[in-house]
């Protein structure tokens, strides 16, 4: 099989290849229509729909597709949608490059026994210049049709009035869904109002959220059209008359104004890319930004970080090398008897000292803690040699603070001639570290990276969860240190992007509530 051969080329060998071969062989399908079931038909091509392994195998199949691209031609792939593009000042140069690429794609498809339907393909010019002539670009001798707009991942790209075309397309979809919503909303036995609002948010307004990094370029007039769609849908969901003021409508529904939420989600998208660092698709292979933000987006992000009193340089990002395994250190969450909170504080203390004496007698002990109050968010760490106390950005959650405390302890309190025992009362941080995945918070990846660095100097690193406020003197000292922070203590400016997004969302909702409170409709 072609796919198995490609897997072997990629270095996927052994039993996994045999399993994949068995998984793909002798597959059949049947079609169910109402209560009838069709006959069995063998599947000769393709991958099973809905299978977890199918997307991975499809990526393996397309792994060498980039070799078909001529120099200067780029591509974007999502599932089986391929978007090939080229930019240059001369049209003849672009035509030649694209034609060469199409010929290479045809050879590649023939070699790997893959069929492409050229009649389903299209080509468009997205430059601001008027074309002197329409170049002829073919695939397998079939001329690719030129179109005014080209659709990729549900977004219409156009040379003229792109925002207007996108809005028109989304608006037509939204109106169809609003009409469908009316059929279930105007009934005494229909869904609850809360569920109808969720339908509006997740089915209608989400059409605008999906492409927020593009729709945030709308003009104010186009934004008003978006808001009209939202208020129309909410009136149907709430069963309120047309003359209900929009500000009252938003307050009752507990929703943000759609145009403001689009801008917020766009900002969150760009912040997330900053946090992903070199692993973000906006960076090229040389770790340099491959795209440039337009002026409006730059101003939006600058204003946001000014409002939050921080900068993009202080966002906790993915480490350059991602960690794909979770067994890089020992993590004890419920392995010892003292980790049972049902015990009394005095018993927990005695059991802890017994475990340390038996299991960690020669370890260098470090305890960390974090504190969050109306005045400060702080972290602290202590060992029998030294200690530290820092203020951190108040936006950071207590989860982020606890993780940063361990990171700082590894930097400042470690010794090179002993194994390390780190004590923390944050169960959630250790649980996240133990279950490390690509989707884990960035601060957990930062912590994992620091542990791996320290493992070069230590035989063992053990992290142990200790119940809080249980008279364990190490924890009590760290807790006291964290709570004694003042303005004079040094500031660590690191901030988690997850906390920025959470804070930004809170501020946005507060602005909606303030608008209502300052309106004439507030009693």
Indicate where each model-derived feature is located.
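Mobile genetic element proteins and their domesticated derivatives, centered on retroelements
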Residues: 7, 20, 31, 50, ...
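Active-site palm subdomain of RNA-directed nucleic acid polymerases
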Residues: 55-85
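RNase H-like, metal-dependent ribonuclease domains
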Residues: 128-131, 139, 186-190, 194, ...
